[in-house]
Design a protein with these regions (language model features):
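Short acidic/His/Gly/Ser-rich catalytic and metal-binding motifs that mark active-site loops
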Residues: 44-45, 120-124, 206
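Flexible, solvent-exposed loop segments that connect beta-strands
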Residues: 48-52, 126-127, 295-303
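Exposed, low-structure sequence patches enriched in small/polar residues
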Residues: 60, 80, 98, 149-157, ...
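Surface-exposed coil loops of outer-membrane beta-barrel proteins
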Residues: 110-181
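Beta-barrel outer-membrane channel/assembly domains of diderm bacteria
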Residues: 19-104, 349-354, 365-367
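Sec-dependent N-terminal signal peptides
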Residues: 2-17
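Short, glycine/acidic-rich beta->alpha junctions
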Residues: 59, 91-93, 137, 172, ...
Length: 368
């Protein structure tokens, strides 16, 4: 029971992942052909009204069907398509092929080239990797090495957002990242301490393209500690604190807003009971900018050109309820609130998701 409690608590506290979106381990079933279905129907209404970011609504769905072939116990090949549509457009806003080859060292460690497992599964913090990328940029392309265990999670990847050819007039865009979490051995019967470390490098440039913009490279890091105590007899109920330090740097020292170095701190109280979680926190930053982050936390305006509010102070709160059904379907309701103490404005976001994921065996190719 103690072993089960530790394992469950680690995943409940650290992941927030959809059961439907987790990567299935199927490489042990050699010479089989599978159909993998991944679907997310979403509504996210951002009621923002401040100089940094204006309100907008994301509503739509994506469908990502894939055919997976397992030629060997450790090798799998996947081919499919990612289809993204926003409601009211009457069309697909994004249609892209997905293809990957994966080598599995074990049931918890793999190396992949091609389409990665999904942007939300990096388990990154919202201020430097916007959780809305789950809707807008789910299917990343590049290479990835991931390993996880009872006490740790490590995801190292490189994703290519924009490829350039000789003579192009645009920049190549790529992101390299590391997401690491470690659950310390218990120092008290009811106390659990986790240490997260996250790193992102975002590059805009390229040598063979003829573009007007300058080469830019940004480094964002997050390091913190999360401590929780058992809040009841249930192994998936906890309460605790989390403190995370963020830094943002322009490695090329040429940020368009003259912000070449910034920092932030996020201090939160949290509570978890089964499928529900509640957080209350305080965010303070100085010249903080993350290219892929949620602009609600940023010092740089996404709304008005050249506007920078160097010092930001926010009181934050969130509620999340996730209801799974038979490990293939999940319903999620989430609320996020932000009160800017300097601007004296309250902004909020409401999210509704229904996510479906299913792996279906369609044929056995093994010779009899």
């Amino acid at each position: 029971m103690m072993r089960r409690s530790v394992i469950l608590s680690f995943f409940i506290v650290t992941t927030g992942l959809s059961l439907a979106g987790q990567e299935p381990y199927i490489s042990q079933n050699a010479e089989n052909l599978y159909l993998k279905l991944n679907n997310l129907n979403f509504v996210r209404n951002n009621e923002y009204s401040n100089p940094i970011i204006e309100g907008y609504t994301l509503i739509g769905y994506f469908l990502q069907p894939e055919i997976i072939y397992i030629p060997d116990e450790k090798v799998s090949v996947s081919l499919g398509a990612h289809l993204l549509s926003y409601s009211g457009t009457g069309r697909f806003s994004k249609i892209k092929p997905v293809f990957s080859t994966t080598f599995s060292f074990s049931d918890s460690t793999f190396f992949r080239i091609g389409t990665l497992t999904g942007s939300d599964e990096h388990r990154l913090q919202d201020p430097h990797f916007n959780k809305e990328r789950l809707y807008t940029d789910f299917a990343e392309d590049g290479l990835q090495f991931r390993s996880s265990g009872k006490r740790y999670f490590s995801d190292t990847w490189l994703s290519w957002q924009n490829f350039i050819f000789r003579g192009d007039n645009k920049r190549e865009i790529l992101t390299a990242g590391e997401s690491f979490r470690y659950l310390l051995p218990r120092i008290a019967p009811n106390l659990r301490i986790e240490v997260p470390f996250q790193l992102l490098i975002k590059h805009f440039g390229g040598q063979i393209s003829d573009y007007d913009q300058q080469v830019e490279t940004y480094l964002n890091m997050a390091l913190g500690i999360r401590a929780g105590i058992d809040a009841g007899k249930s192994p998936d109920s906890m309460a605790g604190i989390e403190c995370i330090y963020f830094s943002g740097n322009s490695l090329t020292k040429n940020s368009p807003w003259d912000i070449n170095k910034g920092y932030a701190g996020w201090y939160k109280l949290f509570g978890i009971y089964k499928n529900a979680s509640l957080e209350a926190g305080y965010w303070h930053s100085d010249n903080y900018y993350a290219p892929d982050g949620n602009f609600i936390f940023s010092s740089v305006s996404d709304r008005f050109e050249d506007l920078v509010i160097s010092e930001r102070s926010l009181i934050t709160g969130s509620f999340n309820l996730t209801l799974p059904w038979k490990d293939m379907l999940e319903f999620t309701f989430a609320f996020d609130g932000y009160y800017d103490t300097d601007l004296r404005r309250f902004d909020n976001a409401v999210t509704l998701n229904i996510r479906f994921g299913k792996l279906i065996k369609i044929a056995s190719l093994r010779e009899k």
